[in-house]
Amino acid sequence: MFYSIVAIFVGAGFGAVLRWFLALALNEFFPAVPLGTLAANLIGGYVIGVAAVVFTARVGLPPEWRLFVITGFLGGLTTFSTYSVEVMTHAVQGEFGWAIAVAALHLTGSFTLTALGMWTARAWFAAA
């Protein structure tokens, strides 16, 4: 139990710091669509796709690795709450086009990159 908690704690810290760096580096470029939040969610979508295949195919990996990557790192990196407030801020301000665009970018982008991550990992295993 202790190692599981440590794995989640450390992974979440790395993920949250990466999300913060992405926000610092990217959000200023296009305020209508905070690119740091979008990048965090898209990266998270790709990584979860890869991780889903890897952790299913490599059943011998210690469970702490799954907790570190999926629960910790990706839990700290990706952000549904920030995405939600960004969409709702546009909606409350009457910017419904932007609200729909931001929502669509996050949802379609994340699903697409999750599928791409799964495809990539399957291709790696097929080639090995």
Swiss-Prot record:
Catalyzed reactions per annotation: fluoride(in) = fluoride(out)
Keyword Membrane listed: yes
Gene Ontology cellular-component terms listed: plasma membrane
Record: residues binding Na(+): G75, T78
Keyword Transferase among UniProt keywords: no
Places the protein is found: Cell inner membrane
Single GO biological process annotation from the record: cellular detoxification of fluoride
Entry membrane topology: Multi-pass membrane protein
Activity control summary: Na(+) is not transported, but it plays an essential structural role and its presence is essential for fluoride channel function.
GO molecular function list: fluoride channel activity; metal ion binding
Keywords in alphabetical order: Cell inner membrane, Cell membrane, Ion channel, Ion transport, Membrane, Metal-binding, Sodium, Transmembrane, Transmembrane helix, Transport
Main localization category: membrane
TM annotation in the entry: 5-25, 35-55, 67-87, 96-116
Role according to the record: Fluoride-specific ion channel. Important for reducing fluoride concentration in the cell, thus reducing its toxicity.
Family indicated by similarity: Belongs to the fluoride channel Fluc/FEX (TC 1.A.43) family.
Entries under HAMAP family matching the protein: FluC
Protein name in UniProt: Fluoride-specific ion channel FluC
